[in-house]
């Protein structure tokens, strides 16, 4: 689970169904989703339109696709952008398409049971 707060106070993020790994192509499953927590709580589930769930490269990570990322962050988690994506049918999650990050939280759970 990745949660981002931008400089305008918007809080949003995404759930990754798989462990992040550097890859040249998209990975993940329909269990992935994007969400907004502030200013409005809303969840954006997989539409079934494509399988562009997660992308991880040395320079960035991204959620969703189909023309543009629903959520994209640079490798340092300092800047990002959010656009409508076909994968999750989300609007831009931040107040501006390109945003600066004030804080990031990441939670992960390993299959320990």
State what each model feature region is.
Residues 1-113:
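Phosphate-recognition beta-domain surfaces
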